[in-house]
Amino acid sequence: CGKGASLKNFLKHLDPKLMNDYIFEKYRKDDKPVQVKYEQPKYFGQGAKSLKELKKVSSLKLDHPVRQWIVERKIPSQYHYLLYYAPKFYQWVNTIIENKFPSLEKDHPRLVIPFFEKNKMFALQGRAFGDENPKYITIKLQDKEKIFGLERVDWKKTVYVCEGPLDSLFVENCVATAQSDLRIPHDSAVLIPDNEPRNREVVKQIKKYIEEDYAVVLWPEYVKEKDINDMIKAGKTRRQIKTIIDEHTYKGVRANLEFSKWSKTNV
């Protein structure tokens, strides 16, 4: 970002706990005790108090099942602080929205993905770890568009848009809509739909993007995985995926031509 910062300050900005651990490791052999002062991130608005009751993935022990789940999905470690663990998701949500889940009979653990803007949580998503249905539960706390990553995006640059919040963590300056409709009001947006050329609904949606003159990524045939996280798990690197995105982003007449070759269903 063009702004110099020491490792300590970088860690402080990223996650105060990581900064604290770094300083402890750096000075643990010194004779003099080190006094460390830092401020926890301050979250405001509905749900802020309840969010503090959960543990960040970055604070879980390495052998914790949730931490292992995140590592197995190869989520970049610098973003673990954005994710939280709710042992009883329904019960926790009810502390934010009273009686949101009247029955706690089938309560279960979920990964909590908060949506922030200017340190205010305006929505959250609970992702199942197993076969629980629905796989994703997205809850709006304010009447605004569900866009994950607003607190980190630079609107002066090209903004990439995908569906899944976890997928967005693998692409620089990327946000997620947490729904199949990826359209956002931004001239330099590049929409990254899932790689489903045989899914009629996805294909119809992409056709609409092209008609509305959005820049759209149409994954090449040699990419077999459905989404970015699956590509990462299959062995592709973030750099390789970014190269594929750059080389297969289309708009206008060219987008229509490539779409006709990419689509494997009639719409």
List each model region and its residues:
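TOPRIM metal-binding catalytic domain and adjacent DNA-binding surface shared by DnaG-type primases
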Residues: 14-112, 118, 243-267
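Hydrophobic alpha-helix position signal
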Residues: 11, 70, 74, 209-210, ...
